[in-house]
C-alpha cells in the first residue's frame, strides 16, 4: 500500500547532526525506519523557529535545504520528488520520495522572489505561520495581531495560488483559516493536526473548518502527537512538570494514547470531511513524545490494518494512507 506522510521535521534533526542514512536508536525518523514502515513518500518540513525573523529566518531555511539535499543524495534508495509523476517514478524504482515543505512563512520575509525560488528548488507547500503571529497571519497560539491574514498575507495567498504552491493552514488561528478559505482559489491543506471535537488542543481544528477545507477540495492530515490526540494525556503531561528531553518519563504516563486514539481521529475526520479528503501527517521528529506502539515511522505500516478493523474499506484506507494527498499534489 502506498503511504505518504504530509509532515515530518527531519531537516531540523539533520542539521543537528543526525545521519538519516543510518538506523538511529531512539530516533523517530530516518531512511531505514521509513523503509521498514512502508513509507513511500514523506514531506520533510524546513522548520523556521518563531524566534528567527527576516534575513535570519531566510538563511536558516536555505541551510536546512542544503543539509537535506546533502543527506538525500547520499541515500541510495531515496530521491527528491516535486509532483505526483516523480513520486510514481520513484515508487517504480523502489525509492522513497522526499518532498519539501516550508514550515513558517516568516522565511519569505515579504518577498515573492524568495517564494518562487523555494518553489523552483522543490518546496511544494508553505505552512503560513508557527507558534507566533508573523507578517503573514495570526497563529493559533499567537496574540491575534491581524484578526486573521495580514494585508501581505492576502497577497501571498493569491501569489501561491498563481504559482501552484499549496497553502498549509496547520498552526493557523481559526480566523486565519477562514480568511484563507475565503480568498484562495485553490484547495488548502492542513498537514498535521487533529479534530478539536475529540481533543481541545488549540492546534486542532473544529469540525466546521475541517469540513470547509474538504468542501474546497483540500486534505487534512491527522497527526500522531499524543497531546493532539488526547485531552487526558495533555492534562497529565502538563501537571507532571516533565521537561523537554524527559522522553522516557513522558512515555510512562498512564494516559498515553495508542494507535486506537489516532484511528478515532481519522474516523472522525472521515465522518466530517469524507474519506477522500483525509490523510496522514505525523509530525514525527518535531514532537517529544509519541503514541504507545508508534514510537517511529517504522510503525506506520500498522495503521492500515487498524483502520480496516475499524470498518473502513480498502479504497478509503488507500486514499487516507497517501493517495488523497498525492492526488492533490
Where are these regions (language model features)?
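Structural recognition of the beta-strand scaffold that forms the well-ordered cores
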Residues: 2-5, 40-45, 97-100, 125-128, ...
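A metal-dependent hydrolase metal-coordination microenvironment
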Residues: 28, 33-112, 128-133, 137-162, ...
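Short acidic/histidine-rich active-site segments
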Residues: 222-224, 273-296
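Mid-to-C-terminal alpha-helical segments outside catalytic/metal-binding sites
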Residues: 295-329
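Conserved, mostly hydrophobic/aromatic
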Residues: 7, 34, 83, 122, ...
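Acidic/histidine-rich helix-loop elements
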Residues: 10-27, 47-59, 109, 133-149, ...
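Histidine/acidic residue-rich metal-binding segments in metalloenzymes
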Residues: 110-120, 124, 142-189, 202-218, ...
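Short catalytic helix/loop segments, enriched in acidic residues and glycine
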Residues: 19-36, 302-305
Amino acid at each position: 500500500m502506498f503511504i505518504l506522510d504530509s509532515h515530518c521535521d527531519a531537516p531540523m534533526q539533520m542539521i543537528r547532526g543526525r545521519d538519516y542514512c543510518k538506523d538511529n536508536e531512539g530516533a523517530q525518523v530516518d531512511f531505514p525506519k521509513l523503509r521498514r514502515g512502508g513509507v513511500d513518500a514523506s514531506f520533510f518540513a524546513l522548520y523556521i523557529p518563531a524566534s528567527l525573523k527576516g534575513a535570519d529566518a531566510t538563511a536558516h531555511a536555505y541551510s536546512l535545504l542544503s543539509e537535506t539535499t546533502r543527506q538525500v543524495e547520499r541515500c541510495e534508495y531515496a530521491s527528491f520528488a516535486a509532483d505526483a509523476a516523480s513520486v510514481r517514478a520513484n515508487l517504480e524504482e523502489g525509492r522513497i520520495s522526499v518532498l519539501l515543505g516550508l514550515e513558517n512563512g516568516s522565511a519569505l520575509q515579504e518577498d515573492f522572489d524568495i517564494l518562487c525560488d523555494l518553489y523552483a528548488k522543490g518546496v511544494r507547500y508553505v505552512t503560513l505561520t508557527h507558534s507566533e503571529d508573523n507578517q503573514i497571519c495570526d497563529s493559533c497560539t499567537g496574540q491575534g495581531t491581524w484578526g486573521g491574514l495580514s494585508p501581505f498575507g492576502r497577497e501571498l495567498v493569491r501569489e501561491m495560488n498563481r504559482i501552484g504552491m499549496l497553502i498549509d493552514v496547520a498552526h493557523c488561528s481559526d480566523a486565519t483559516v477562514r480568511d484563507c478559505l475565503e480568498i484562495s482559489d485553490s484547495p488548502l491543506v492542513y498537514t498535521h493536526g487533529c479534530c478539536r471535537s475529540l481533543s481541545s488542543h488549540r492546534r486542532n481544528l473544529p469540525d466546521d473548518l475541517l469540513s470547509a477545507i474538504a468542501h474546497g477540495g483540500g486534505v487534512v492530515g491527522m497527526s500522531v502527537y499524543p497531546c493532539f490526540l488526547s485531552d487526558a494525556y495533555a492534562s497529565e503531561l502538563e501537571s507532571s512538570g516533565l521537561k523537554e528531553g524527559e522522553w522516557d518519563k513522558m512515555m510512562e504516563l498512564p494516559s498515553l494514547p495508542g494507535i486506537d486514539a489516532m484511528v478515532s481521529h481519522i474516523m472522525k475526520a472521515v465522518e466530517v470531511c469524507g474519506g477522500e479528503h483525509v490523510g496522514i501527517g505525523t509530525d514525527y521528529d518535531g514532537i517529544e513524545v509519541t503514541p504507545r506502539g508508534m514510537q517511529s515511522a517504522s510503525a506506520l505500516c500498522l495503521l492500515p490494518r487498524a483502520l480496516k478493523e475499524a470498518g473502513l474499506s480498502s479504497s478509503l484506507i488507500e486514499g487516507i494512507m497517501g493517495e488523497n494527498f498525492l492526488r492533490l499534489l
